[in-house]
Regions:
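Bacterial N-terminal signal peptides that target proteins for export
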Residues: 19, 27-39
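Compositionally biased, proline/threonine/alanine/serine-rich low-complexity intrinsically disordered stretches
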Residues: 45, 51-66, 75, 281-290
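Acidic/charged, solvent-exposed loop-and-adjacent secondary-structure segments enriched in E/D, K/R, S/T
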Residues: 139-166
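Short, Lys/Arg-enriched N-terminal segments with co-localized hydrophobic residues
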Residues: 9-27
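Tryptophan (W) side chains
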Residues: 4, 9-10, 32
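Bacterial N-terminal signal peptides
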Residues: 37-48
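Gly/Pro-enriched, hydrophobic low-complexity segments
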Residues: 127, 189-280
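N-terminal mature ectodomain segment of secretory-pathway/periplasmic proteins
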Residues: 63, 70-146, 173-181
Length: 290
């Protein structure tokens, strides 16, 4: 899952709980991350725009339908290629989150460090949410559940999404790729690829037939409340330090929808490993002195 889909995947998990805003308790069972990745990027699942050949007015022969493996290869090339990605070892991204149905807006910030550390912080409606993984332990901290360690399928999800090079390591996380046809996604003709994860989930990825960009991803996320299917739509791709990233991710599920817009991205930032570790719990209350 690509960066923003990974991030939005984590955001959606954070926002499934309730937050207090202006004296009201809002139940927020929203989607994602991950995004690809976004966020997951996850998304997250973001793909670079390939340069378009100029139209010289001549009729071009119809291109042969590529295989699923060729589509994946085009994706890796489109986002800059493995060499460009491995020149980067960390990332900080800042942006905004909007939930129109609840008239809520806030900020989101993600920190990522190779090989597999990630931290997402969301401030929304006066409440703060955090989700982190140090490569070994995945954890979250939110107003409803407090600080907790993730377990089972939820923890496995978080650890997979924390791979900094997930987008060029996708063959590591998907055991099977199957091209099912071509579909229209907005203004894009897209190849629809069913991808079976090593965890057994079936994701559906839509790649622009011309650019190789991922324009939509339908993925399964595991939470303490059960599995959740999320649709991520990616747009506004920009060049960033030799790679391309989508700066807008819109996510929707059966519960709600929201939009992440990233405004600032920096690579090769220095992070201490301790920043991604689960915070120490508050000390137990001491008995009163007699």
């Amino acid at each position: 899952m690509l960066p923003w889909v990974r991030t939005s995947w984590w955001v959606s998990k954070l926002l499934r709980e309730s937050v207090s805003r202006e004296g009201r308790l809002l139940k927020m069972k929203t989607n994602w991350t991950k995004i690809f990745a976004v966020m997951l990027a996850s998304a997250t699942l973001s793909f670079a725009v390939l340069a378009q050949a100029p139209d010289n007015g001549t009729q071009k022969p119809a291109a042969a339908t590529p295989s699923a493996d060729q589509i994946l290869d085009k994706y890796v090339a489109a986002i800059g290629g493995e060499a460009a990605w491995h020149k980067l070892n960390s990332r900080i991204a800042k942006g905004t989150i909007e939930i129109p149905a609840m008239s809520l807006s806030g900020t989101v910030e993600s920190h990522e460090k190779a090989p597999n550390s990630m931290l997402v912080v969301v401030n929304l409606g006066g409440a703060a949410f955090q989700r982190g993984c140090d490569g070994t332990t995945a954890w979250s901290d939110d107003p409803q559940n407090g600080l907790r360690t993730e377990t089972g399928a939820e923890a496995d999800d978080s650890k997979r999404q924390s791979d900094f090079y997930h987008q060029v390591n996708m063959r590591k996380y998907y055991s099977k790729w199957n091209l099912t046809g071509t579909e229209k996604i907005g203004d894009h003709d897209a190849y629809a690829v069913e991808a079976t994860s090593t965890a057994g989930d079936m994701d559906k990825l839509y790649f622009d037939t011309q650019t190789g960009l991922l324009v939509r991803a339908i993925t399964t996320v595991h939470t303490p409340q059960g599995a959740m299917v999320i649709q991520s739509d990616l747009s506004d791709y920009r060049d960033t330090d030799g790679i391309k990233l989508p700066f807008t991710v819109h996510q929707s599920s059966a519960q709600s929808d929201y939009t992440l817009k990233f405004t600032e991205v920096k690579h090769n930032v220095q992070f201490a490993d301790s920043q991604f570790a689960k915070p120490a719990t508050e000390p137990a209350a001491q008995p009163a002195a007699h």
